[in-house]
């Protein structure tokens, strides 16, 4: 919370200065935000992908810049467009969540790329349902944790590890392709992935039990 407060202070100072310089800005509506995020979800920019896991750049700031620049594709005037403070908070929090996950977990390059593809969909979730930040059992959080756990330390050395990584990629592909504004897909994919992970866990226990 302290980090978010510091981010707000810096952001508010920058916003005030910008408004003095160019006049009153108009925050993007939620409909515009969702439309822009859907564009980024379908075709993420190279600069946003490069910012994922980059210690020298804030993922949240890069995402906010991408949202504003992509809003021009909807006919929004870039000279007056800005973000609603609550939307900025949501992006900041999601950015922090992924920054911490990518920094603290042992994720290989392929895993980092797959987890990074979830950033934009999760910003959409945050705009639709703020409970994601306070409800640990939120389906989107459960799915993200399950995917990250499956990827952590997984170099694909064994056949079962490769199969699991393939399933992670399948889940990510489906989420990116199918998620619009219905959160039900997170519950469906989380249950499906949990079943596959349980099969792998039982299989590993059986092999360990019977190995010499």
Spans of features found by a protein language model:
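Extended, low-complexity, amphipathic alpha-helical coiled-coil/linker regions that act as scaffolds
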Residues: 1-207
């Amino acid at each position: 919370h302290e980090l978010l407060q510091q981010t707000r202070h810096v952001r508010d100072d920058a916003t005030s200065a910008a408004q003095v310089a160019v006049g009153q800005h108009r925050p993007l509506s939620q409909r515009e935000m969702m439309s822009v995020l859907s564009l980024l979800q379908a075709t993420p920019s190279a600069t946003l992908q490069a910012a994922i896991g980059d210690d020298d750049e804030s993922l949240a700031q890069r995402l906010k810049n991408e949202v504003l620049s992509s809003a021009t594709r909807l006919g929004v005037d870039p000279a007056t467009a800005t973000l609603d403070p609550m939307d900025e908070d949501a992006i900041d929090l999601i950015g922090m969540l992924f920054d911490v996950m990518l920094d603290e977990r042992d994720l290989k390059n392929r895993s980092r790329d797959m987890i990074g593809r979830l950033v934009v969909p999760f910003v959409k979730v945050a705009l639709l349902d703020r409970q994601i930040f306070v409800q640990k059992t939120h389906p989107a959080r459960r799915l993200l944790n399950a995917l990250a756990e499956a990827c952590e330390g997984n170099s694909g050395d064994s056949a079962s590890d490769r199969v699991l990584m393939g399933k992670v990629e399948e889940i990510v592909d489906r989420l990116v392709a199918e998620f619009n504004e219905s959160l039900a897909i997170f519950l469906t994919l989380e249950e499906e992935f949990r079943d596959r992970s349980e099969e792998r866990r039982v299989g590993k226990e059986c092999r360990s039990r019977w190995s010499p």
